[in-house]
């Protein structure tokens, strides 16, 4: 299992990014969570097979149709997750 922390910057709030990411994560079988940050970015932790995590990271670099992703910072992290949660702001 691979676990990554993502910090996603750009026009990523108010564009259905979190809900879209939750749906994509469930489609790919990725666990973790996603939430908005006060600075206007989106933060997520994703966990799954190397292939599934890579696919979700690739999706995050594009985002949903109304988003404009400028940057995605990745770092390895630890934890155990079950399901994918859209957290409150």
Curated annotation (Swiss-Prot):
The active site is at 18, 36. InterPro entries: Acylphosphatase (IPR020456), Acylphosphatase-like_dom (IPR001792), Acylphosphatase-like_dom_sf (IPR036046), Acylphosphatase_CS (IPR017968). Its EC number is 3.6.1.7. Keywords: Hydrolase. PROSITE patterns: ACYLPHOSPHATASE_1, ACYLPHOSPHATASE_2, ACYLPHOSPHATASE_3. GO terms for molecular function: acylphosphatase activity. It comes from the Bacteria. The keyword Ribosomal protein does not apply. Residues 3-88 form the Acylphosphatase-like domain. Transmembrane segments: none annotated. It catalyses: an acyl phosphate + H2O = a carboxylate + phosphate + H(+). Belongs to the acylphosphatase family. PANTHER family: ACYLPHOSPHATASE. This is Acylphosphatase. It comes from Thiobacillus denitrificans (strain ATCC 25259 / T1). The gene is acyP.
